[in-house]
Amino acid sequence: MTRVRRGYIARRRRTKIRLFASTFRGAHSRLTRTATQQKMRALVSIYRDRGRQKREFRRLWIARINAATHENGVSYSRLINDLYKRQLLLNRKIPAQIARYNLNSLYMISNEIIKEKRD
């Protein structure tokens, strides 16, 4: 029986795995089997942490807005509720950025809402 030369498909698959794992440390970037395992583990972590990142950023934005509005005597929930009642559709990222970089603007927004509510 004559010897059959192998094709390139397995080599191409391993090359793709090696390129993905090239920044891993130690044997995780050099050995095919461990690189494959670490690639699967990395993809699981990436998928899981995308959802986790959304939750953590939302918590951070709420904490920033709450800290800024409490200095003005308004609670976070009151501010968000009044924004929705006035149909000002701001997500939590925008007021958090305003609270971080331009606190007076957030004070003006909350005072305007409070003033209209009293009238």
Swiss-Prot record:
Q: Which SUPFAM superfamilies match?
A: Ribosomal protein L20
The record ties this protein, via Pfam families, to: Ribosomal_L20
Compartments annotated for it: namely: Plastid, Chloroplast
List cellular component terms (GO). chloroplast; ribonucleoprotein complex; ribosome
Keywords for this entry? Chloroplast, Plastid, Ribonucleoprotein, Ribosomal protein, RNA-binding, rRNA-binding
- What superkingdom heads the lineage? Eukaryota
GO function terms (MF aspect):
rRNA binding; structural constituent of ribosome
**PROSITE patterns from the entry?**
RIBOSOMAL_L20
Keyword Ribonucleoprotein (UniProt): yes
Keyword RNA-binding on this protein? yes
GO annotation terms (biological process)? ribosomal large subunit assembly; translation
Q: Which NCBIfam families match?
A: rplT_bact
**Which HAMAP family does the record match to this protein?**
Ribosomal_bL20 (MF_00382)
Q: What does this protein do?
A: Binds directly to 23S ribosomal RNA and is necessary for the in vitro assembly process of the 50S ribosomal subunit. It is not involved in the protein synthesizing functions of that subunit.
Q: Which family does it belong to?
A: Belongs to the bacterial ribosomal protein bL20 family.
Designated name of the protein: Large ribosomal subunit protein bL20c
What species is given as this protein's source? Answer: Amborella trichopoda
The top of its lineage is: Eukaryota, Viridiplantae, Streptophyta, Embryophyta, Tracheophyta
